UniProtKB/Swiss-Prot annotation:
<feature type="binding site">
    <location>
        <position position="886"/>
    </location>
    <ligand>
        <name>Zn(2+)</name>
    </ligand>
</feature>
<feature type="binding site">
    <location>
        <position position="510"/>
    </location>
    <ligand>
        <name>ATP</name>
    </ligand>
</feature>
<keyword id="KW-0813">Transport</keyword>
<feature type="binding site">
    <location>
        <position position="87"/>
    </location>
    <ligand>
        <name>ATP</name>
    </ligand>
</feature>
<keyword id="KW-0472">Membrane</keyword>
<dbReference type="GO" id="GO:0008564">
    <property type="term" value="F:protein-exporting ATPase activity"/>
</dbReference>
<dbReference type="InterPro" id="IPR011115">
    <property type="entry name" value="SecA_DEAD"/>
</dbReference>
<dbReference type="InterPro" id="IPR014018">
    <property type="entry name" value="SecA_motor_DEAD"/>
</dbReference>
<dbReference type="GO" id="GO:0031522">
    <property type="term" value="C:cell envelope Sec protein transport complex"/>
</dbReference>
<feature type="binding site">
    <location>
        <position position="895"/>
    </location>
    <ligand>
        <name>Zn(2+)</name>
    </ligand>
</feature>
<keyword id="KW-1003">Cell membrane</keyword>
<dbReference type="InterPro" id="IPR011116">
    <property type="entry name" value="SecA_Wing/Scaffold"/>
</dbReference>
<dbReference type="InterPro" id="IPR000185">
    <property type="entry name" value="SecA"/>
</dbReference>
<feature type="compositionally biased region" description="Low complexity">
    <location>
        <begin position="860"/>
        <end position="872"/>
    </location>
</feature>
<keyword id="KW-1278">Translocase</keyword>
<dbReference type="GO" id="GO:0005829">
    <property type="term" value="C:cytosol"/>
</dbReference>
<comment type="similarity">
    <text>Belongs to the SecA family.</text>
</comment>
Length: 900
């Protein structure tokens, strides 16, 4: 109570921040008139003036008012759009590396231009991040005229671009792209062998659109570049037959409960019971996949166990038309937050292969991780990070904790007039959908458009069937119809339009009341007459006014999402820029959120009220209880994301060390000093193994040392002979003599090859060894991560154990890199340029002969009475119709003559 009173007197922290920004807005407004008088050339010339001032030491903050005034004036001239005062505040929030929460329709794309322009003045590059390629290209093309007018270059990165195009896009002042593309380019840059093949510059400043979707919803999805490994598709196909035989254990609390697996729906986790293990082992023995008497948990059978778990998850957890769709011969993942399909994305840990087996499509090979990171760790690499969204305040704590980003709620330009009605809760899904259809019919009869948000493709199609039966015209926007997205959204605001859409997050398009005039004008084409354009504008104005008079857009939610933010995003589609509108959520006790987290309590309440089929309960107390359940789920999801980050932070520290070393190797022209240091460490380690430090002669294993040097390094070290010849050759002098032998071998090779070629060879060896061992290390880390939770059963802290073991693994990796580099350089046989040319010429000649033999063999196998294959001897000159001298029995022109 006291806190509320103080807030009313002093204002919230957000209010105080907005008040501070308004003082700077006043300065920008004072400059407006003088900037309005400037010519186009003088206005665009301000960019080079600002750059000069920054180069002389002025700060961005000192030129902010002028820079924002320039962008506002430029936008008015080029695009016919003037930034509102609240949009200027949004630009300041972004410039300070914070998150601007702005309601739908408040012009986030235009707001970004302010901070983007200001930070691009440093010529270090600014990245504008969107959720998909379509929005990246759309926003770049939309804002390009403004930026180019202000003498700024604009580029777009997208999947499928060649390296030169991508590099050029990154060299622009402003680069648009998706979070995936920026992240994957970062990983790819750390896999190239030449500095000139890198495409990204240092990560300077980033503005993330739909920041909650990218930094929170997708935070659990790692970015992985992978390569194929050994094919195990047949195992998935066989084990897929097992999954339908397994029975869920219904009540885990009762003793004697029967079942093969326990499924925790709230955690989306699944575990085999004791009965389940026995059943699976018996079945695998019957199928000949497991030896009699062997355990599924034996070290050699962990791959089988992995396949069993993956197939069980595919059948129980992953649902068709909810988690994925089948398109042709492929399984395509559906983004649970946006309802979009994610072509090219695959689940890891064998899940995707198991789903492919379940649906009977071609099973693609499993993959090995070559490089990986998370969005959390990638975006924390930027010097300055900011973001925009319509709904961030509910996740403000997480943004602050994980990314150090404050959330500032930007006041709306006009007062929100949307009415948010209490939820209606029904006993069953059927009752709920019947009520939704009645509501839709009533709203449509009033001449208002309706947007219905569903959580899955399955629900959108179910509701569509209800509406078809009632004869209600409607459009469905889900992962299966995403090609028509722009067209459907453009018409969604027309009078009486009904649009069913899976989660509207990240759609990037506002629903304009009366229909989207700009889209309709574009359809008319460039050749449209003035009369046609005016007629269309008049028609749109009449439609817009009729929808406003009827009450605006009505939003219907078919169930509550786990996150309040997603619900708020759906609601926010109505009431844009002060328009009227309304929203209501329809729930049933069979909805996932209700069923998993709170149905028993509400069910008892509904029974106590004597509710019957078709009746609903509507009460603020119920809506509050649901919100409380959502907070609980959000808290759980935050813990999961935080835990993921804590584990990935360990890997990230290692990743940064490896990537830093890799970069240093690429920029260095001479790595001989590094090689020398490695050689000394490796030789010391080698000698210590057979001649322990400060030991007596009897403890020395000279024979073992000679053998290892010969087998591992290809060097003859007559250590026993040296000791025999020189009785005073003690440990240290002997150690030095062995090192000198390695050094002499190295110098001899360098002299033969030439200094420059040998330096290039060293660099190549270092990079290749580092990459190969890093990939193996990632795989080991993955395996460690997957099984580390089992340490909890031994009363050990899994997180601490993971940190300890991963550190040990990393130390081992660094030692192994040194060892293998020295091993390769010492074992390599070096020829002079002349010798190399002779060997290459001989190789080419042999290759030509081999090719001839291979082709001859393949032709010979098709003939009826072929003889032995040719031995590659030279043949005398023969006529084309004469028998081939190889002895095949064919004419020369049909045999070896066909190759000439």
């Amino acid at each position: 109570m006291l806190g509320t009173v103080i807030k009313k007197i002093v204002g919230t922290k957000n209010d105080r921040e907005v008040k501070r920004y308004r003082k700077i807005v006043a300065q920008i407004n004072q400059l407006e008139e003088s900037f309005h008088k400037l010519s186009d050339d003088d206005l665009s010339g301000k960019t080079s003036e600002f750059r000069d001032r920054l180069a002389k030491g002025e700060s961005l903050e000192s030129i902010l008012p002028e820079a924002f005034a320039v962008v506002r004036e430029g936008s008015s001239r080029v695009m016919g759009m003037r930034h509102f005062d609240v949009q200027l505040i949004g630009g300041m929030v972004l410039n300070e590396g914070k998150i601007a929460e702005m309601r739908t329709g408040e012009g986030k794309t235009l707001v970004a231009t302010l901070a983007v322009y200001l930070n691009a003045l440093s010529s270090k590059g600014v990245h504008v991040v969107t959720v998909n390629d379509y929005l990246a290209k759309r926003d770049a093309n939309w804002m390009r005229p403004l930026y180019e007018f202000l003498d700024m270059s604009v580029g777009v990165v997208f999947s499928g671009q060649d390296r030169d195009e991508k590099k050029a896009a990154y060299l622009c002042d402003i680069t648009y792209g998706t979070n995936n593309e920026f992240g994957f380019d970062y990983l790819r840059d750390n896999m190239v062998f030449r500095l000139e093949d890198r495409v990204q510059r240092d990560l300077h400043f980033s503005v993330v659109d739909e920041v909650d979707s990218i930094l929170i919803d997708e935070a659990r999805t790692p970015l992985i570049i992978s390569g194929a490994v050994e094919d195990s598709s047949e195992q998935y196909r066989k084990i897929n037959q097992l999954a339908p035989l397994l029975v869920k254990q219904e009540d885990t609390d009762e003793e004697g409960s029967v079942g093969h697996y326990v499924f925790d729906e709230s955690q989306r986790s699944i575990e085999l019971t004791e009965d389940g293990h026995s059943f699976v082992e018996e079945w695998l023995v019957e199928q000949g996949m497991l030896a009699e008497g062997e355990s599924l948990y034996a070290a050699g059978n962990l791959s089988l166990l992995h396949h069993v778990h993956a197939c069980l998850k595919a059948h129980v957890i992953f649902k068709k038309n909810i988690d994925y769709v089948v398109q042709g011969d492929q399984i395509v993942i559906v983004d649970e937050h946006t309802g979009r399909t994610m072509a090219g994305r695959r689940w890891s840990e064998g899940i995707h292969q198991a789903v492919e087996a379940k649906e009977g499509v071609t099973i693609q090979a499993e993959s090995q991780t070559l490089a990986s990171t998370t969005f959390q760790n990638y975006f924390r690499l930027y010097e300055k990070l900011s973001g925009m969204t319509g709904t961030a305040d509910t996740e403000a704590f997480e943004f602050q904790q994980i990314y150090g980003l404050s959330v500032i709620v930007i006041p709306t330009n006009r007062q929100v007039q949307r009415k948010d009605f209490n939820d209606l809760i029904y006993m069953s899904t059927e009752d709920k959908f019947e009520a939704i259809v009645l509501d839709i019919e009533e709203i449509v009869n009033q001449g208002r458009p309706v947007l219905v948000g569903t959580a899955s493709i399955e629900y959108s199609e179910l509701l569509s069937n209800y509406l078809v039966k009632k004869g209600v015209k409607h459009n469905v926007l889900n992962a299966k119809q995403h090609e028509r997205e722009a067209e459907i959204v453009a018409d969604a605001g027309r009078p009486g339009a009904v649009t069913i859409a899976t989660n509207m997050a990240g759609r990037g398009t506002d629903i304009v009341l009366g229909g989207n005039l700009q889209v309709e004008l574009a359809k008319l084409g460039e050749n449209a007459s003035e009369d046609e354009i005016n007629a269309l504008k008049a028609d749109w104005k009449a439609r817009n006014e009729s929808v406003l008079a009827a009450g605006g857009l009505h939003i219907i939610g078919t169930e509550r999402h786990e996150s309040r933010r997603i619900d708020n995003q759906l609601r926010g589609r109505a009431g844009r820029q002060g328009d009227v509108g309304s929203s209501r959520f329809y729930l049933s006790l069979e909805d996932n959120l209700m069923r998993i987290f709170m149905s028993d309590r509400i069910k008892k309440m509904m029974m106590a009220l004597g509710m019957e089929k078709g009746e609903a309960i509507e009460h603020k107390m119920v809506s509050n209880a649901i919100e409380k359940a959502q907070r609980k789920v959000e808290g759980r999801n935050f813990d999961i994301r935080k835990q993921l980050l804590e584990y990935d932070d360990v890997a990230n520290d290692q990743r940064q060390v490896i990537y830093r070393q890799r970069f240093d190797m690429m920029v260095s022209e001479d790595l001989s000093e590094a090689i020398s240091a490695m050689r000394e460490e490796v030789v010391t380690s080698l000698v210590d193994e057979f001649i322990p430090p400060q030991s007596i002669f009897d403890m020395w294993d000279l024979e073992g040392l000679e053998e290892k040097a010969r087998n591992e390094f290809g060097l003859e070290l007559p250590v026993a002979k040296w000791v025999e010849e020189d009785k005073k050759l003690y440990e240290e002098p002997l150690r030095q003599k062995i090192l000198d032998t390695f050094v002499n071998d190295y110098q001899a090779k360098e002299e033969i090859a030439g200094e420059q070629p040998f330096r290039a060879f060293e660099k190549q060896v270092l990079l290749q060894v580092l990459d190969t061992l890093w990939k193996e290390h990632l795989q080991t880390m993955d395996m460690l991560r997957q099984g580390i939770h089992l340490r909890g059963y031994a009363q050990k802290n899994p997180k601490q154990e993971y940190k300890r073991e991963s550190f040990e693994l990393f130390q081992g990796l660094l030692e192994q890199i040194k060892y293998e580099v020295i091993q390769i350089i010492t074992r390599v046989k070096v020829q002079s340029a002349e010798e190399a040319e002779k060997i290459e010429a001989a190789r080419r000649l042999q290759e030509e002969k081999t090719t001839m033999n291979m082709i001859h063999d393949s032709l010979d196998s098709l003939s009826d009475g072929g003889s032995d294959s040719a031995d590659g001897q030279e043949y005398p000159k023969v006529g084309r119709n004469e028998p081939c001298p190889c002895g095949s029995g064919k004419k020369y022109k049909q045999c070896h003559g066909s190759l000439v």
